[in-house]
Amino acid sequence: MVRTHEKAVEAQFGSRAKAYVDSTVHSQGADLDALDSIVRNSAPTRALDLGTGGGHVSYLMARQAKGVVAVDLSNEMIAAVARTASERGLGNIETVAAPAENLPFEDGGFDFLACRYSAHHWRNFDGGLREASRVLKRGSTAVFIDVYSPGPALFDTHLQAVELIRDTSHVRDYTMSEWIAALARSGFAPVGCQTWRLRMDFPTWTARMGTSEQNARAIRTLQAAASAEVEAHFAIEDDGSFMLDVLMIEARNR
């Protein structure tokens, strides 16, 4: 059977749905606090959570928006979000299974869009951003949050390698400049950007994804062989825990 990228993503995340709903890294953080402020100021009527994962952005937006649509490629992830929303009494969250690059929605059907820790899995980065622009009303706000590459090849190669070994559905963590350029090409005008450093506890990070012992050892081997510069940038600890760079870009749909 042919294993497409979409099937690889669904296989990778379907069995891990509960782990992402329960994940502390995904359920809290400075980025969610910043996003909450933007959502409150926007007071959306219909908001889209693009690549919902464990649904934490949807649960946040449901407190302010009249309606929220949570989209994810994984049917199991969507089912977990629907169950959690029901358990929390959030009746204004609808779930839809679809790829970011081919959204089953009308043009301009949403007045707010948020996308958190999803774009690095997309087969077509620009295609997903173009779809986000298409389904969002002109002049409305979109917020994109993701791990980003620090840029220099020395750091970028290490980052992409450990990400891919841990999660074989990983495509790419983009640089800040790649994000800004892709948003501009896709119809967005960036209006603000914030960055954070996020610590990844190695045992939790690998367990959440169900990374095999063989692959976890491979990551530790890469870390042990890393240059002093790489070790310093990612603040690699003795147990393999390390720091990631995270960005949040607020943009207007042109």
Which residues does each predicted region cover?
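Conserved class I S-adenosyl-L-methionine
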Residues: 1-43, 56-60, 77-80, 143-165, 204-206
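Class I SAM-dependent methyltransferase SAM/SAH-binding core
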Residues: 48-50, 54-102
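Short catalytic micro-motifs in class I SAM-dependent methyltransferases
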Residues: 117-118
